[in-house]
Amino acid sequence: MNENVIALDGPAGSGKSTVARQIAERIGFNYLDTGAFYRALTLYLFRLHGNSPNTESFADWVKTSEAERSLSDIRILCEFSAGKENRIFLNGEEVSLAIRTPEITREIKHIAKRRIYRNFVNQELHSLAKLHKLIIDGRDIGTEVFPDAKFKFYLTASSKVRAERRFLQLQEQGIEADRDEIEKEIILRDKSDMEREIAPLYQANDAILIDTDILSKNSVISKILKILDR
């Protein structure tokens, strides 16, 4: 059993990152957003595709040997900050905001469903878990990445509630967005995450389900802290 990792899984916008950050701060763990690693990887490949003299779509290009070989050139670093989002660096460049744009959100599904890219990210996560006590949020932390985590939680919420949360988050970052479009993208993302062949999104048998539609943020945090104190 891995006591260095607390796993929080669930669909996009279910409140995982907000809850995970605050719990990490209270119990002395580091919060790690796995989605940021996939976003940074997507950003790198998206830029590389844009500079490549090819006519393939991004979805097709990421399947090529050219794209896969580029993994050896990627360095993703995470700077922990108590109570705040991780600062993410891609080959020395801070990309904490660049990885959160709607454009990257739309393209990330092409990366997340390919085993070679998942293996790349998972190796990074396991390396960090050897050095730090982590509370990690993602889609498959308790089912695929750390199935031996001592504590596993699965957070969920309706697509409408999740879209509103994402809209407000983008507003705070100065990024223009449309609520309806965000909800459409969330629904499509859910479908893609749940139906993909590799590491689909689902609740682990031993994970505790928490519906954040009907609980306030503080209630969710209190509930998880009580379970961790058992």
From Swiss-Prot:
Cross-referenced SUPFAM superfamilies: P-loop containing nucleoside triphosphate hydrolases
Gene Ontology molecular function terms on file: ATP binding; CMP kinase activity; dCMP kinase activity
EC numbers on record: 2.7.4.25
Domain of life, source organism: Bacteria
Gene3D superfamilies: P-loop containing nucleotide triphosphate hydrolases
Upper taxonomic lineage: Bacteria, Pseudomonadati, Spirochaetota, Spirochaetia, Leptospirales
Sequence similarity: Belongs to the cytidylate kinase family. Type 1 subfamily.
Subcellular location: Cytoplasm
Broad class of enzyme this protein falls into: transferase
An example Gene Ontology CC term for this record: cytosol
Keyword terms of this UniProt record: ATP-binding, Cytoplasm, Kinase, Nucleotide-binding, Transferase
Reactions catalysed, as given in the entry: CMP + ATP = CDP + ADP; dCMP + ATP = dCDP + ADP
Binding locations of ATP: 10-18
Pfam family of the protein (one): Cytidylate_kin
Coiled coil ranges: none
Annotated GO biological process: nucleobase-containing small molecule interconversion; pyrimidine nucleotide metabolic process
Chief subcellular location: cytoplasm
Protein name: Cytidylate kinase
CDD domains reported for this sequence: CMPK (cd02020)
